[in-house]
Swiss-Prot record:
Residues 80-83 are annotated as: Involved in Mg(2+) ion dislocation from EF-Tu. HAMAP family: EF_Ts (MF_00050). This is Elongation factor Ts. Belongs to the EF-Ts family. It is found in: Cytoplasm. Associates with the EF-Tu.GDP complex and induces the exchange of GDP to GTP. It remains bound to the aminoacyl-tRNA.EF-Tu.GTP complex up to the GTP hydrolysis stage on the ribosome. GO terms for cellular component: cytoplasm. Keywords: Cytoplasm, Elongation factor, Protein biosynthesis. The gene is tsf. The keyword DNA repair does not apply. Pfam families: EF_TS.
Length: 293
């Protein structure tokens, strides 16, 4: 049997919101497999589906820059929130975003080797900023998107760049509508544009979890299938942007809202600073000790 560490229990708690003892039991029952433990908790009705990359720790900024039919969303990390609010750091983030658009670099590694207008490489510029600011800084990721003259980009930054979203709306040049949808995505955090992007494997997995959940609730087998399909539709609505109730007008879906503008959401990228990165250890040992008293 696998040893269940306090760190593993903590990770499961952060992903599911379930209690410490429930998480420990789930990990014990699944031999320390965190993905199976999440399913175990959900089947028992203890936890909801874990959100994608919901462990937020690192500081920094997300920025969106557009130039004609090209746009980029970039995340650059710092060690503290104080530096993220620094005007010099904010200028650096914009400078790097523009460099991505100018060079069309495909990877962070390739970007670091490109030359800025002043003759220095991006790598040298970052090191220079580290020396000036006094903190470790790093370009974490970026994504470039393109459109035609008949389409629109939507750019939205939340909390000064803590969350950033870039949307691509096809068939409409209404940038305000595209931005409104970007705001919706920042708030609701869907995983996909539409259900067409959800893999059959994920749907089958979710269907099985929902089936076990219904059976564990004591529902008769003859109605379980109907219940599962209903809950599956709700699940898809929760993770697919176009099927969600639009945050600025819950009477219509995102798809219906854009249809009134003659447009259709075809792509989006949502970055949240530090998502998926390790959290700092904060009093978890004290919490464990408290449970043992």
């Amino acid at each position: 049997m696998a040893t269940i560490s306090a760190k593993l229990v903590k990770e499961l708690r952060e992903k599911t919101g379930a209690g410490m003892m429930d998480c420990k039991k789930a990990l014990t029952e699944t031999d320390g497999d965190i993905d199976k433990a999440i399913d175990y908790l959900r089947e028992k009705g203890i936890a909801k589906a874990a959100k994608k990359a919901d462990r937020i720790a690192a500081e920094g900024l997300v920025h969106v820059e557009t130039k004609g039919n090209d746009a980029v969303i970039v995340e650059i990390n710092s060690e503290t929130d104080f530096v993220a609010r620094n005007a010099g750091f904010q200028e650096l983030v914009k400078e790097i975003a523009n460099q991505v658009l100018d060079t069309k670099a495909e990877t962070v590694e390739a970007l670091m080797e490109t030359t800025l207008p002043n003759g220095k490489s991006v790598d040298e510029r970052i090191k220079e900023a580290i020396s000036t600011i006094g903190e470790k800084l790093s370009v974490r990721r970026f994504a470039i998107r393109t459109k035609t003259d008949n389409d629109a980009f939507g750019a939205y930054l939340h909390m000064g760049g803590r969350i950033g979203v870039l949307t691509v709306v096809e068939g409409s040049t209404d940038e305000e509508a595209a931005r409104d949808v970007a705001m919706h995505i920042a708030a609701i955090n869907p995983k996909y544009v539409s259900s067409e992007q959800v893999s059959e494997e994920e749907i089958n997995h979710e269907r099985e979890v929902l089936k076990q959940q219904a059976l564990n609730e004591g529902k008769p087998e003859n109605i379980v299938e109907k219940m599962v399909e209903g809950r599956l539709r709700k699940y898809l609505q929760e993770i697919c942007a176009v099927d969600q109730d639009f945050v600025k007008n819950p009477d219509v879906t995102v798809e219906a809202f854009l249809k009134t503008k003659g447009g259709k959401l075809v792509d989006f990228v949502r970055y949240e600073v530090g998502e998926g990165m390790e959290k700092r250890e904060e009093n978890f040992a004290d919490e464990v000790k408290g449970q043992m008293k």
